[in-house]
Swiss-Prot record:
Keywords for this protein: Menaquinone biosynthesis, Methyltransferase, S-adenosyl-L-methionine, Transferase, Ubiquinone biosynthesis
GO molecular function terms noted in the UniProt entry: 2-methoxy-6-polyprenyl-1,4-benzoquinol methyltransferase activity; demethylmenaquinone methyltransferase activity
SUPFAM superfamilies named in the record: S-adenosyl-L-methionine-dependent methyltransferases
Gene responsible for this protein: ubiE
Protein name: Ubiquinone/menaquinone biosynthesis C-methyltransferase UbiE
Pfam family for this entry, one: Ubie_methyltran
Amino acid sequence: MSQQNGNADRVGAQGGMEHSFGFKAVDESEKQGLVNDVFHKVASKYDVMNDLMSAGMHRVWKDAMIAWLAPSKRPGWTSLDVAGGTGDIAFRIVEASGRQAHVTILDINGSMLGVGRERAIKKGLADNLEFVEASAEELPFEDASFDAYTISFGIRNVPHIDKALSEAYRVLKPGGRFLCLEFSEVELPVLDKVYDQWSFHAIPRIGKMITGDADSYSYLVESIRKFPKQQDFAAMIEKAGFERVSYRNFTGGIAALHSGWKL
């Protein structure tokens, strides 16, 4: 994308690690709190947010993610969905497994988890799910605990992406699968310009109309532009120890689905 700036974290002039909150440079200690505040504000309208960010395509991309994961229908198969508070991915996994899978939904934001719990009860899926409030950088699970690890539109908000990837590798069983769906770099020049106009001008305005909050939506757009390109993120996944790393672009690169295996 024309405003892509690569990885959000970089070494500053004083030798310390700088972090960004959207396009704004912030201290490492500030970032998580700022991100949490955004998601407290948008939790009740999270599906609306994703519809705005993707023009409704996130539903198609998530279905494709689950198809590529191909959850097992054998009893005892387990999956960890990180930053999955409202349950979109976890619900799909449970249904695709014939309601055999057990999915742990982990999110650092209690408001998001609250929405997920309510939705799970309404869908009759609560028995297949566990909700855990914790950080992606410090997963409260033993080594080799899960058959699959998923994260959808969440990893770009983690202050230390490398730590989250290392933790993903740690908690997966040998032979386990890592899948990450995230907004990415548009690779079609014409679509790039159109998407920039939509993202930076339309989304914050519509977000304000629907939720009364334009700033949160501006941050979410900016955070996409700060996220690593497809190839760079694939290299980070490999560095964490994963093998057979690959990715698929959706809608010209507006989103990308990365895959890796713990072998």
